[in-house]
């Protein structure tokens, strides 16, 4: 079977197309940064380690990303006074502003790709992805 017909090769190409479109529309915000900001917005003061899943990264990579975001004024982090190993994260006013502007753009990029499928196909696609991830 030709490589172009392999499922994961096709998925990688699709992901690369989506990433290129994302970077074109939101050049100052990576998809992992966006996901982390959405998670923080959903739960202000979230513990830093709880963001690993949202960032789809390691603890070290997440810490580096949050440090860069903190330097840009997008997030603030505070240590737990009772346990200095724990850190909690909030969006700053600037982070909230950036995220509010990014959400409709991110949604439109996703819709550009998902819109190629009917509503029924989108449901099936999500079911299949969840099934493969949870197997």
Curated annotation (Swiss-Prot):
Keywords: DNA-binding, Transcription, Transcription regulation, Virulence. Residues 4-134 form the HTH marR-type domain. It comes from the Bacteria. Residues 48-71 bind DNA. InterPro entries: HTH_MarR-typ, Tscrpt_reg_MarR-type_CS, WH-like_DNA-bd_sf, WH_DNA-bd_sf. It holds the Pfam family MarR. The keyword Transcription applies. One of its GO terms (molecular function) is DNA binding. Involved in the temperature-dependent positive control of flagellum-driven swimming motility and cellular aggregation. Regulates fliC expression by directly interacting with fliC promoter. This is Transcriptional regulator HosA. It comes from Escherichia coli O111:H-.
């Amino acid at each position: 079977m030709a490589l172009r017909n392999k499922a994961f090769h096709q998925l990688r190409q699709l992901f690369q197309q989506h990433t290129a479109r994302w970077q074109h529309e939101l050049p100052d915000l990576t998809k992992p940064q966006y996901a982390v900001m959405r998670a923080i917005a959903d739960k202000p003061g979230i513990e830093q380690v709880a963001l690993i899943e949202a960032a789809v990264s390691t603890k070290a990579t997440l810490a580096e990303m949050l440090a860069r975001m903190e330097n840009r004024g997008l997030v603030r982090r505070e240590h737990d006074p009772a346990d200095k190993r724990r850190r909690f994260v909030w969006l700053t006013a600037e982070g909230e502003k950036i995220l509010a502007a990014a959400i409709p753009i991110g949604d439109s990029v996703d819709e550009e790709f998902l819109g190629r499928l009917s509503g029924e196909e989108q449901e099936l696609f999500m079911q299949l992805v969840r099934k493969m991830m949870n197997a």
